[in-house]
Each structure stands twice: as C-alpha cells, then as structure tokens.
Amino acid sequence: YYVRSQFNIADIVQHNLSNIELTAYVVALEINGMNIRETADLTMAMVETGDTITFDRGPIFDFHSVGGCPGNKITLIVVPIVAAAGLIIPKTSSRAISSAAGTADIIEVFADVNMDAHKLRTVAEKVGGTLAWGGSMSLSPADDTIIKVEYPLGIDPHAQLLASVMSKKKAAGANCLVIDIPTGAGTKVPTIEEAQAFARDFMDLGEKLGIEVRCAITYGEQPVG
C-alpha cells in the first residue's frame, strides 16, 4: 500500500489530478476508510513529498486540536505557555476545513502567519515557539491541496485527518505531541466512544512514526472562550 500511496500523493502534489478526481479520492476515504498500517503509509508518503525540519536540540514538542468546536482558540494559549517553559514548539496550523475559521485564520487577525520552513526553525529556536500557517511552507504539501477539496464538501475523512495532522508534525520534527479531541454534539467527534477510538488511533499511528502521543478528550458542546 505504501507504493500506491506514494503515487497518489505525488500526483496530488504535482497537480496531475483534476478537481473531480481529487474529490472522488476524498469521498472514497470518507466512505471506505483505512486501517492504521495504511494510514501510516499515507502519512509517510505525505511527509516525503515535502520539506522536513531538523532541530539542533530536542525534544521537540507540538500540540493539535482536532477542532470542530466553535471559538476554539486553545492553540493561542498553549504555544506561549510551552515556549515560556523553555521548550521548543514549532506549531503549524491549517485554515478552515469544516468551520468558518481555522487556527491559522484566527492568528492572522493579529499577525502574519506566512513563513517558510527555514524561518519556522529559526524563529522556534530563537523564541521557543511559532504560530504559522502550514500552507505557507512545503511541509506535507499534499495536505493543503486536499483541504481545498474537503472544505466545500464539509467532510474531513478519519484517515485523512490522522494523516494530515501527523504528517505535519513528523515533517516539523516533533518528538512529543498532545492531541486535544473536543467531544460532544456538533463536534467532529460526537460521542465518548468515538473519541476514545480516535485517541487510540492517534497513539498507534504515533508509535509507528516514532512520535510519543498523548490525547486529551475534552468537552466540546459549547463554544470555547
């Protein structure tokens, strides 16, 4: 499956697929899903088609919220706290996928979120943390092309969500990752059982990629902040 994923992702990055073909790919993922081994292969294919960052010191920490909860601004609080503790957290975020605004859109209200991989590393090593749009650099470049199809469809396939998050973290050099999974009516993960399954998948995928993952299942039935 790894070789097939390489060809699929290479076609996406090189823009060899029409919007109709790419839509069919995303819908197929939504309907059929993938097991963890297939998701790990997809994730590594996404990493290898873009740039990667290596830091001179570690460990490298990161944080991600699955999203789907209105008003979620947790990242804007977590990153400064981690950086203030003397740790490195090179945080990249996406624009909106299934909501009105993604983390990168929110940060952009206050500051420029565009930086390349070299600048991300430089800033993270200098001040400890970054708040950047992942689409402005070539970390897992297939992801942003796929997101452009997911947004109008209003879907975020389980396997693609896992691969999207973990490919960006792997490419950014993360060793330790915390995943926030907002749960409840109106979120991407409506039940505690689904949240627990999501957490297991993230941790299993992290183990295959060499990233230590811890998950927090949080209440998401009301706006955050």
Label for each model-derived stretch:
Residues 1-70, 110:
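Acidic, glycine/proline-rich low-complexity segments that act as flexible tails and inter-domain linkers
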Residues 6, 21-22, 55-60, 83-84, ...:
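A short alpha-helix capping/helix-coil boundary motif
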Residues 12, 29-33, 67-71, 96-97, ...:
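Short, small-residue-enriched loops and turns at beta-alpha junctions
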Residues 29, 42, 78-85, 103-106:
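Buried hydrophobic packing segments
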Residues 51, 74, 86, 109-225:
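Glycine-rich anion-binding loops and their surrounding alpha/beta cores
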Residues 59-99:
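Glycine/serine-rich anion-binding loops at beta->alpha junctions
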Residues 96-111:
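Active-site-proximal loop->helix
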